[in-house]
């Protein structure tokens, strides 16, 4: 079963500068029964990744455009080719709004921080959507 893990775009998945979410994902992935069919997607400028199954999403910031929107759009382009069964989203419930055109996939959201303070899960309406 193919699993895609999407890190927050500011999260660094490198040995030199790994964030808490990256360390969590790397640690869990080591013991997963699906580790051979799992890909971790993110954006970093470093080359020494925490695991071999990491895919660096090409990402260039465009003036007056949402960095999150560009990042998720680039991930969706990659995901349309890969066709994972499960997509894990870490710490960014607002990303779910962009995945409406990806069908036949299951989504898992990990909250590493307080969900009531995160964009995309503050209001009752947003939480019902999730």
Regions found by a protein language model. Give the residues of each.
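Flexible, charged surface loops at secondary-structure boundaries
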Residues: 33-34, 78-83, 101-103, 130
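An amphipathic, basic-hydrophobic alpha-helix
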Residues: 61-86, 96, 128
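N-terminal strand-loop element at the rim of the active site
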Residues: 6-15, 23-67
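Extreme N-terminal starter segment of soluble prokaryotic enzymes
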Residues: 1-4
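Membrane-proximal helix-turn-helix segments that form the acceptor-binding/catalytic region
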Residues: 27, 73-80, 115, 119-130
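Short, charged/polar "capping" segments at the starts of alpha-helices
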Residues: 46-50, 96-97, 117-119
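Short His-centered aromatic/hydrophobic patch
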Residues: 89-94, 111
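Acceptor-binding helix/loop patch of EC 2.4 sugar-transfer enzymes
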Residues: 8, 15, 57, 101-105, ...
């Amino acid at each position: 079963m193919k699993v895609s893990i999407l890190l927050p775009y500011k999260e660094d998945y490198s040995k030199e500068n790994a964030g808490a979410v990256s360390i969590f994902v790397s640690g869990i992935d080591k013991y997963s029964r699906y580790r051979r069919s799992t890909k971790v997607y993110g954006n970093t400028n470093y080359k020494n990744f925490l695991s071999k199954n990491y895919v660096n999403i090409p990402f260039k910031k465009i003036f007056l455009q949402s960095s999150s929107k560009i990042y998720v759009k680039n991930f969706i382009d990659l995901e349309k080719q890969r066709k994972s069964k499960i997509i894990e989203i870490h710490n960014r419930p607002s990303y779910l709004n962009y995945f409406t055109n990806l069908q036949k996939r299951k989504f898992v959201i990990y909250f590493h921080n307080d969900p009531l303070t995160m964009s995309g899960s503050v209001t009752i309406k947003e939480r019902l959507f999730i």
